[in-house]
């Protein structure tokens, strides 16, 4: 009898962003004043009106199993939101609610990937994508994006990496970790190319509300029915309404795919916590949500400007101004090389400056560091000041 764990988990790595955040929390518990730039979550609390809707649902006894794809009211509200805001028409039967966008992506990759199928990943990329793809026997294929071009994705970039085994491309705009918002015209060209080649588009739109300046967010599925038919539109309540711990995300896609994803959901998650779904429903239906989102977006835009200004004071620092999300992704290569890489640099900054950052190699970009500016302006300035001071000793 063979013993031991399955080979599929032998190379599985824990999330580096969660690991960094855990280390920072551990130090804080010991009384150390650590400034955390690692967290991928807003520092705002979930609005009270959303919490109250959840409490109300609890008191009304909404504590039993729910339909695996999500309560009907929530799926209907998501369909209304997608039509009104994203200009894409979906039926509730084409929507599946699961335990956060991360679980939604897990189910999508489970549904579409066979051994050896390739998935294009514009790089830098969110740390979870390649791990999930490999877990299901897929091959992540990096599409390197240039800092000098603002980490924008072009059709030519995509064409260079497409092969007969290409099954899908992940589009994450606004982007984590770079903050890039992909240009609409280029996205259209890429989408049309994917239609021609029969390549799925997995559109991760979790940061759609956090777009700054002249940048414009667009859902690829809105381009045409042909594009919609090959697209998995993924979103969540985590960032938009500061509900990261609630774990509620969803996918909208053609019904034949939605049925498969719902079946997989039923055999894994069963259903998202029933009473929590009523909080998500309130987030979509309550007019106060718009004011809350605007408040967060305005705060993040101010902090982005502050982060760019403060980081630019560090000698040799090259900073691309983010157009969206709430991350900044500066090139620290000049300093990382002196210490043996960006992982060593992040360890040095945690030890010396008591600042937690995420090494760029986790995102496929060695030499860079990701800093979240989802923290108070005062702590933001103090944290970058500490980084600057520590780097002077290298």
Swiss-Prot record:
Residues with PTM N6-(pyridoxal phosphate)lysine: 239
Top-level taxon in the UniProt lineage: Bacteria
Protein name per the record: Probable aspartate/prephenate aminotransferase
Residues holding L-aspartate: 40, 126, 176, 370
Gene Ontology molecular-function annotations: aspartate-prephenate aminotransferase activity; L-aspartate:2-oxoglutarate aminotransferase activity; pyridoxal phosphate binding; transaminase activity
Catalyzed reactions: L-aspartate + 2-oxoglutarate = oxaloacetate + L-glutamate; L-arogenate + oxaloacetate = prephenate + L-aspartate
Keyword tags: Aminotransferase, Cytoplasm, Pyridoxal phosphate, Transferase
BP-aspect Gene Ontology terms: amino acid metabolic process; biosynthetic process
Sites annotated Important for prephenate aminotransferase activity: 13
CDD domains: AAT_like
Annotated family: Belongs to the class-I pyridoxal-phosphate-dependent aminotransferase family.
Cofactor: pyridoxal 5'-phosphate
An example Gene Ontology CC term for this record: cytoplasm
Classification via Pfam families: Aminotran_1_2
Subcellular location: Cytoplasm
Assembly mode: Homodimer.
Record gene name: aspC
Main location class: cytoplasm
Function, as annotated: Catalyzes the reversible conversion of aspartate and 2-oxoglutarate to glutamate and oxaloacetate. Can also transaminate prephenate in the presence of aspartate.
The EC number(s) this enzyme carries: 2.6.1.1, 2.6.1.78
């Amino acid at each position: 009898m063979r013993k031991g764990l399955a080979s599929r988990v032998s190379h599985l790595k824990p999330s580096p962003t969660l690991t960094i955040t855990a280390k920072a929390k551990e130090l804080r518990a010991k009384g150390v004043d650590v400034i955390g730039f690692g967290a991928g979550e807003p520092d705002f609390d979930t609005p009270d009106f959303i919490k109250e809707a959840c409490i109300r649902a609890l008191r009304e006894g909404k504590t039993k199993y729910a339909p695996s794809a999500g309560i009907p009211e929530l799926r209907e509200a998501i369909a209304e939101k997608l039509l009104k805001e994203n200009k894409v028409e979906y039926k509730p039967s084409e929507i599946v609610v699961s335990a956060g966008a991360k679980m939604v992506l897990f189910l999508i990759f489970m549904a579409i990937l066979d051994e050896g199928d390739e998935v294009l990943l514009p790089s830098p990329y969110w740390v979870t994508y390649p791990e999930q793809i490999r877990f299901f026997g897929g091959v992540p294929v990096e599409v390197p994006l240039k800092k000098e071009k603002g980490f924008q994705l072009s059709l030519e970039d995509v064409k260079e990496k497409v092969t007969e085994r290409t099954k899908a491309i992940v589009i994450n705009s606004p982007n984590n970790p770079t903050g890039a918002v992909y240009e609409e015209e280029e996205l259209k060209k890429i989408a049309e190319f994917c239609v021609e080649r029969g390549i799925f588009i997995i559109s991760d739109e979790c940061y759609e509300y956090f777009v700054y300046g002249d940048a414009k967010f667009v859902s690829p599925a809105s381009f045409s029915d042909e594009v919609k038919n090959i697209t998995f539109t993924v979103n969540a309540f985590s960032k938009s309404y500061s509900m990261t711990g609630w774990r509620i995300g969803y996918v909208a896609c053609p019904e034949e795919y939605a049925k498969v994803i719902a079946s997989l959901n039923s055999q894994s998650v069963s259903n998202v916590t029933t009473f929590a779904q009523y909080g998500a429903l309130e987030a979509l239906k309550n007019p106060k949500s718009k004011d809350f989102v605007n408040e967060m977006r305005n705060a993040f835009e101010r902090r982005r400007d502050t982060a760019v200004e403060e980081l630019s004071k560090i000698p040799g620092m090259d900073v691309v101004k983010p157009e969206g999300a709430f991350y900044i992704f500066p090139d620290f290569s000049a300093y990382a090389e002196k210490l043996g890489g960006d992982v060593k640099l992040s360890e040095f900054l945690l030890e010396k400056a008591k600042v937690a950052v995420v090494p760029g190699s986790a995102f496929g970009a060695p030499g860079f560091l990701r800093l979240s500016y989802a923290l108070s302006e005062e702590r933001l300035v103090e944290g970058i000041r500490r980084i600057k001071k520590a780097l002077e000793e290298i």
